[in-house]
Amino acid sequence: MAKGQSLQDPFLNALRRERVPVSIYLVNGIKLQGQVESFDQFVILLKNTVSQMVYKHAISTVVPARPFNVTGHQNAQGGYGAQDDAPSGE
């Protein structure tokens, strides 16, 4: 895992896992809203009424709508997604 990913991945994964609504501001000023459905090294899949694939290089800021706990859990493929949704201990 690259050093720059050490905070980003657990942050995005906690948002995804807890289904926290987010506002994502792009570098061009556009505001997107929804829930993080999945993500990898380059993109975030944002779900609202439709799913949008947002390239990370176009993102300026990610703002959670409510407080949440950040803990890291990475799957064997090196990404985060539906396969690690089960609560810990199950």
Curated annotation (Swiss-Prot):
A cellular component annotation (GO) from this entry: cytosol
Q: Name one GO molecular function term.
A: RNA binding
Q: Which UniProt keywords apply?
A: RNA-binding, Stress response
One Pfam family name is Hfq
InterPro entries for the chain: Hfq, LSM_dom_sf, Sm
The organism's superkingdom is given as Bacteria
Please state every residue range assigned to the domain named Sm: 9-68
GO terms in the biological process aspect are:
regulation of DNA-templated transcription; regulation of RNA stability; regulation of translation, ncRNA-mediated
What is the documented function of this protein?
A: RNA chaperone that binds small regulatory RNA (sRNAs) and mRNAs to facilitate mRNA translational regulation in response to envelope stress, environmental stress and changes in metabolite concentrations. Also binds with high specificity to tRNAs.
Q: Which HAMAP family match?
A: Hfq
The record's note on quaternary structure and interaction partners says: Homohexamer.
The similarity comment for this entry is: Belongs to the Hfq family.
Kindly provide the name given to this protein in its UniProt entry: RNA-binding protein Hfq
Q: Which organism is it from?
A: Shewanella baltica (strain OS155 / ATCC BAA-1091)
